[in-house]
Structures are given as C-alpha cells and as structure tokens.
C-alpha cells in the first residue's frame, strides 16, 4: 500500500495546497495531511483549527485524512508506515530548499522518498502568507482559498481586531 504524507503548516490552507492534495491523492492509496503542531512560525490558527479547516476542504477525497503532528516528519512517516513525502514546488527557490530537506530526510530514513509536484500555473505565486496579508486588510481572498473557509479566515481577523 502506497502511503504518502503531505506535511505543512497550512495556515490557512490555500487553493494551491488543495491542488497538490488532489493530484497527490491520485497516485497514493492513502494520503495523510500532516499538520505541523510545533512550527517555527507563529500561526494565525491553532493546530486544531487548521486540522478542522483541512478536514472541511478534503471531505470529498476518500483516501485523504488529516492528522496533527510535531517532531521530525520522517519519524511521523515511520509511525504511519508511509514511504513517500509529498511537497509542492512553486519556484526554483522552493526547489533549492526542498531538495535539501528531501536529501536530509532520505539520510535519516533511506526508505523515505520525496515526491515533488510543481504547482499548477494558476497557483504558482500563492502562499498562506499572501492570503493572511490580504485578509488582514479585509481584501478579497476568494480566488486564493476554498470557498468553505473564507468566512472563517475573515472572522479570525475580525476577532483579533476586537481583542
């Protein structure tokens, strides 16, 4: 059975992430979206919120599940019996960084291989950081995130403003 892990912070999940999820789910028997709990970034959403948002947007993909984790991705993969790590590449700068990580992960566990997906052209510029920047000013994020989570993102910023 081919089990893949797509790790990330997904803060928030974007249409670019969803594109990689849908495409990678086609080549894996099971795809686990690993939501990083101890990211070095300060998240907008808690890990629990990010898991719920992802579950909402992938509910129509039967072989995908969402799990929070912390620690090394290779240890998480080993625990789940996964042999493949999924990564999306937007630009050559992504490739340089992701290649280093992929080679390091392979050194840590030689049974782990990284599968790279180049981002579809319409999402090649997109990042969660861009979405957060636009949303923080009340801009239109409907072209960047799944419709089902747009209001949740705006609500998060409205709540931050009223605190």
UniProtKB/Swiss-Prot annotation:
Pathway noted in the entry: Cofactor biosynthesis; coenzyme A biosynthesis; CoA from (R)-pantothenate: step 4/5
A GO MF label: ATP binding
PANTHER family according to UniProt: PHOSPHOPANTETHEINE ADENYLYLTRANSFERASE
Site (Transition state stabilizer): 17
Keyword Magnesium in record: yes
Species for this entry: Lachnoclostridium phytofermentans (strain ATCC 700394 / DSM 18823 / ISDg)
Gene behind the chain: coaD
Cellular compartments per GO CC: cytoplasm
SUPFAM superfamilies per the UniProt record, alphabetical: Nucleotidylyl transferase (SSF52374)
Keyword Isomerase carried by entry: no
Summary of subunit composition and partner proteins: Homohexamer.
GO biological process: coenzyme A biosynthetic process
EC assignment: 2.7.7.3
Alphabetical list of InterPro entries matching this protein: Cyt_trans-like, PPAT, Rossmann-like_a/b/a_fold
Keywords: ATP-binding, Coenzyme A biosynthesis, Cytoplasm, Magnesium, Nucleotide-binding, Nucleotidyltransferase, Transferase
Residues the entry annotates as binding substrate: 9, 41, 73, 87
Cofactor(s) the record lists: Mg(2+)
Pfam families found in the cross-reference section: CTP_transf_like
Lineage of source species: Bacteria, Bacillati, Bacillota, Clostridia, Lachnospirales
Reaction(s) catalysed by this chain's protein: (R)-4'-phosphopantetheine + ATP + H(+) = 3'-dephospho-CoA + diphosphate
Protein name in UniProt: Phosphopantetheine adenylyltransferase
Protein function: Reversibly transfers an adenylyl group from ATP to 4'-phosphopantetheine, yielding dephospho-CoA (dPCoA) and pyrophosphate.
Disulfide bonds: none
